[in-house]
């Protein structure tokens, strides 16, 4: 049984490292699109792919909140056609939480999950 536990621990560590790298790529893409260095449609498609991947894997490795944050990020990105400085700052809010939770190594308790999810940017709030 110890060998299986070692494998699971290694896979979780790989997920953590991969997710931190994805957060870096997401933030780089946000900066490049907001700065006009990359085309918005290409960058936004890349953001969707990265968020979708994190969403799909997070729960399997004990980070359901990271999956929920990535899902919210996907929803936020869904209607974007460009990324200005305000959108960039809002998008970084998602990666900041993803990074903080992943670096902690554990999913927060339920009451903290609720607080974090309520703090995330939404498109409907921005439109109003």
Where are the regions that the model predicts?
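Long, amphipathic alpha-helical coiled-coil segments characteristic
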Residues: 4-47
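Residue-level recognition of alpha-helical structural elements
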Residues: 8, 36-43, 66, 83-87, ...
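Generic L/I/V-rich hydrophobic alpha-helical segments across diverse proteins
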Residues: 23, 30, 51, 70-73, ...
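Secondary-structure edge/capping motif, primarily at the C-terminal ends of alpha-helices
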Residues: 26-37, 58-61, 77-80, 102-105
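Structural secondary-structure packing elements that flank or coincide with functional cores
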Residues: 90-128
């Amino acid at each position: 049984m110890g060998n299986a536990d070692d494998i699971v621990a290694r896979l979780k560590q790989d997920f953590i490292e991969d997710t931190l790298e994805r957060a870096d790529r997401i933030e780089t893409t946000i900066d490049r699109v907001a700065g006009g260095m990359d085309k918005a449609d290409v960058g936004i498609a890349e953001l969707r792919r990265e968020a979708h991947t994190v969403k799909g894997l997070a729960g399997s490795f004990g980070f359901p909140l990271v999956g929920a944050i990535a899902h919210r990020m996907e929803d936020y990105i869904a209607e974007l056609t460009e990324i200005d400085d305000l959108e960039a700052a809002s998008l970084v809010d998602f990666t900041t939480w993803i990074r903080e939770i992943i670096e902690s190594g554990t999913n927060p308790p339920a009451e903290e999950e609720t607080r974090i999810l309520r703090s995330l940017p939404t498109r409907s709030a921005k439109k109003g």
